[in-house]
């Protein structure tokens, strides 16, 4: 005979019968579901490419926005130090510095390439 005291009823345990169904992963329209805060991914995914000039101008506008945002955070830190987190200041300074160095490197490479092209002729 089965000891009725030690036998657990599987139907009475709430978590054992409620198994969630896993749906199949559909990747047909994966790019449409991507969310971006910049237009760069959208431009890269589109068939029509932006001109080189437009790409450079957008990059410089982004760099300028980061520099301006950092200036505003710096002013706010001086006026009301308790309203700004030090971590935000540090991250903003690093991001602005990196974007400025990247822009400087791109300009230097463009000037060097232009000089190489003009001296070869």
From Swiss-Prot:
One of its GO terms (cellular component) is bacterial-type flagellum basal body. The keyword S-adenosyl-L-methionine does not apply. The keyword Repressor does not apply. Belongs to the FliE family. Keywords: Bacterial flagellum. It comes from the Bacteria. HAMAP family: FliE (MF_00724). One of its GO terms (biological process) is bacterial-type flagellum-dependent cell motility. One of its GO terms (molecular function) is cytoskeletal motor activity. This is Flagellar hook-basal body complex protein FliE. It is found in: Bacterial flagellum basal body. Pfam families: FliE. InterPro entries: FliE.
